Amino acid sequence: RQRQMCIRDRALLQKCAVPLLAAAMPRAVWLLADTPALTEAGILPGEDVHKHLAGCGQAILLAVTLGPGVDAQIRRAGVGDIAAGVASDALGSALAEQAADAAEAQLRQWAATEGKYLTGRFSPGYGDWDIAVQPLVAAALDTVRKAGLCVTDTNLMTPRKSVTALLGVSDHPVKGQLAGCGHCVLRTRCEYRKRGKTCASE
């Protein structure tokens, strides 16, 4: 029975993936800036983001979106089929992370040619880097014009399947602060963890 469920789940994911991939139009925009300038602009509040940028004189702001077509396809998939809607939403989140990974890989290639080193990605909502900075990040990157990415009054991104992040830039090897539940100030009262999930999986 468990094997049958796995086969059925795999078939559902494959069925949902085809139209989702067809609807995706990934776009990425990034900006290299001095960290003091970002701090002065109010983009780097909190301690955790500064720990992540320790030893970095510059940082890269990055935004990646799959475009509105993916959001629309997720809605269509869920009409009359809750399982397909949930599967499509999960696939969309995974696809957005893959697009962010691809953009990061390009940035690492650029850094290598410049003799620079990058930290990993650190996104608004990690640790005490409040998602309230999303409008400032979007404005600095001009995401509305360059990528069609907007931020709502409640600091949510539209299209939903989008990622914003920051990477530290240094002249010497750096790791940055590891992201994840173990480093999150909300880990002891996180509603996602109570349900056996993480915010990254939503």
Where are these regions (language model features)?
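Short, small-residue-biased leader/transition segments that mark boundaries at the very start
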Residues: 2-7
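Flexible, glycine/charged-enriched surface loops at secondary-structure junctions
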Residues: 8, 26-32, 107-122, 195
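Active-site bordering "gate/hinge" segments
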Residues: 8-17
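Structural signal for hydrophobic packing residues in well-ordered secondary-structure cores
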Residues: 17-24, 107, 111, 185-188
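A glycine-rich, hydrophobic loop/mini-helix early in the fold
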Residues: 19-84
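Conserved mixed alpha/beta catalytic, RNA-binding, or beta-rich assembly cores of soluble enzyme
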Residues: 56-123
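Short terminal or interdomain "cap/linker" segment that borders an active site or interface and mediates
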Residues: 114-192, 202
